[in-house]
């Protein structure tokens, strides 16, 4: 599958699992915040995998992060593509420098 087929498959999976179903009731319905917390959980797993230099776990965590972001985008009536394009359009104009292994933007 190409990327866009995978994105669509993830959206369909989320629909099938009821993640995007707003009629799950207040205690069971997924919300943008609960999905954001799931993303944070997966990012933590990525950090653990990187710290352990575990390539398979890095791949798994990055994939899981993408899944949570695709679902979040769907919840927000956005596409990951438009979010990425928006961010790219901002960063291409950004100036800054590398500090301690990270790019730090100028104010």
Functional labels for PLM-detected ranges:
Residues 1-62, 66-107:
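Flexible "arm" and connector segments at domain edges
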């Amino acid at each position: 599958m190409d990327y866009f087929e995978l994105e669509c498959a993830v959206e369909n999976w989320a629909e099938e699992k009821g993640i995007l179903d707003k009629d799950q009731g207040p205690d069971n319905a997924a919300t943008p915040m609960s999905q954001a917390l799931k993303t944070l959980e997966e990012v933590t797993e990525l950090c653990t995998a990187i710290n352990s230099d575990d390539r398979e776990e890095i791949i798994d965590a990055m994939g899981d992060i993408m899944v949570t972001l695709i679902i979040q985008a769907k919840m927000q009536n956005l596409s990951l593509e438009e979010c990425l394009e928006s961010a790219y359009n901002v960063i291409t104009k950004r100036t800054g420098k590398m500090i301690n292994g990270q790019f730090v933007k100028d104010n």
